């Protein structure tokens, strides 16, 4: 376009030149020759400029190409490093954890009930029992114990031999950090079939879960999820002091889980696994009272439960501590069997029973782990915590309390709250409990 205008401009110059030199032939020839030369020169100049522009663009392109190669190399290095990090991240396990605390028999003798009534001013307040241990119970994802009594408001509250407590006892358990209570034990029918049902109602009203008794078959298995880990709970009893047979034949009591039918237990464990349980915890009420070693029936059934798929078997009933063993299942898993944990709280003691073991108990702190990537699960750690159950006297009566022994021995946070005589009992409870818990099982 520019060239077109240039030619027009030059044509005008030529026209003017021709007019001015119309009488001079030589001048006309020179003018034409000069203009032609000018056009040629301008064309050459344009070509030179275009070539310079082309060369500049080529040089720029080459520089850009070199820069791109460097950038590409940098990007490749960065991409490789990113991929390596991603590969490492894929291999690195994503561990989820859950802390379970397991406790023994939660009893309520008449002295405990009377104290709670006096403390509550006409109501029932059991909170003093747990003054020293509540922080420990709360510090867990799930805390579970055996509720060895009933709660039936239609019958008098009582201790041994037919236990019955007000609903407030369960509320106090909830307040100190309990999440689950087992309701299958030899005292489950102390207030008859009605008591089995009212106890379940009271447990739910307190905000707790129960396992071992049920209103429908789906409640045989209690499934809880903590931090992405699913834990199934099962509970069974050897019987109910024969009371079921006084009311109806035991096989017709359709609201309790019994130990007699091994196929049912095996089926329950398989069902729990089918429901997605990562770990299965079984609470059997078994063994012989006041025996520090499990009998053959306990060891046989406990190990079978692990072989069937259970991971933890937490026994109760003897009211004294029995050994804890790690047992390798037939599929290579390692399961834990605690044959008996003793009395978490009760008014059984040396003075009343002439047996110091009944005032000693064991709490288990169990750390469970699951790798979300590989799906691998394991019992990561188990810690033994001995407990001593002692009594005090005040204006309300006999104040029964449980004591985590580590808190009352040298360096413990409650060291100064007991006298030397009490500390000696606490030390004995600590040592005896750890010794029996670590005793091997044949």
Language-model regions, residue ranges each:
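Sec-dependent N-terminal signal peptides
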Residues: 6-13
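Positively charged n-region of N-terminal signal peptides that target proteins for export
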Residues: 1-5
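Acidic, metal/ion-coordinating pockets
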Residues: 23, 30-58, 63-442
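C-terminal motif of bacterial Sec signal peptides marking the signal peptidase cleavage site
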Residues: 17-20
């Amino acid at each position: 376009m520019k060239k077109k205008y240039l030619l027009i401009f030059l044509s005008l110059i030529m026209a003017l030149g021709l007019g001015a030199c119309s009488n001079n032939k030589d001048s006309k020839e020179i003018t034409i020759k000069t203009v032609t030369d000018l056009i040629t020169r301008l064309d050459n100049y344009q070509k030179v400029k275009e070539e310079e522009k082309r060369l500049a663009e080529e040089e720029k392109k080459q520089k850009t190409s070199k820069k791109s190669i460097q950038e590409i190399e940098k990007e490749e290095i960065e991409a490789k490093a990113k991929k390596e990090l991603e590969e490492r991240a894929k291999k690195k396990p994503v561990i989820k954890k859950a802390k379970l605390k397991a406790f023994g028999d939660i009893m309520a003798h008449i002295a405990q009930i009377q104290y709670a009534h006096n403390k509550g001013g006409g109501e029932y307040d059991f909170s003093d029992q747990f003054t020293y241990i509540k922080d420990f119970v709360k510090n867990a994802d799930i805390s579970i114990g055996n509720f060895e009594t009933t709660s039936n408001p239609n019958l008098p509250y009582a201790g041994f031999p037919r236990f019955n407590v007000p609903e407030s006892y369960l509320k106090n358990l909830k307040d100190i950090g309990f999440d689950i209570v087992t309701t299958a034990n030899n005292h489950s029918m102390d207030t008859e079939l009605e008591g089995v049902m009212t106890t379940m109602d009271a447990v739910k009203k307190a905000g707790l879960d129960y396992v071992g008794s049920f209103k429908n078959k789906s409640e045989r298995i209690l499934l809880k999820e903590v931090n992405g880990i699913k834990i199934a709970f099962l509970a069974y009893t050897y019987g109910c002091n024969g009371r079921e047979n006084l009311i109806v034949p035991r096989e017709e009591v359709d609201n309790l889980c019994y130990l007699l039918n091994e196929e049912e237990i095996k089926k329950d464990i398989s069902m729990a696994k089918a429901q997605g349980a990562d770990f299965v915890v079984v609470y059997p009420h078994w063994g012989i009272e006041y025996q520090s070693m499990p009998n053959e029936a306990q060891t046989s059934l406990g190990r079978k439960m692990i072989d069937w798929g259970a991971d933890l078997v937490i026994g109760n009933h003897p009211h004294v501590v029995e050994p804890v063993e790690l047992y390798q299942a037939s599929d290579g898993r390692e399961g834990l069997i605690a044959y008996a944990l003793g009395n978490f709280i009760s008014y059984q003691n040396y003075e009343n029973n002439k047996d110091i073991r009944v005032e000693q108990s064991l709490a288990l702190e169990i750390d469970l782990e699951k790798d979300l990537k590989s799906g691998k699960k394991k019992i990561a750690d188990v810690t033994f915590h001995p407990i001593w159950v002692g009594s005090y006297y005040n204006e309300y009566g006999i104040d029964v309390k449980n004591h985590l022994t580590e808190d009352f021995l040298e360096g413990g946070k409650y060291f100064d709250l007991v006298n030397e005589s009490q500390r000696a009992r606490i030390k004995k409870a600590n040592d005896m409990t750890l010794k029996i818990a670590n005793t091997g099982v044949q």
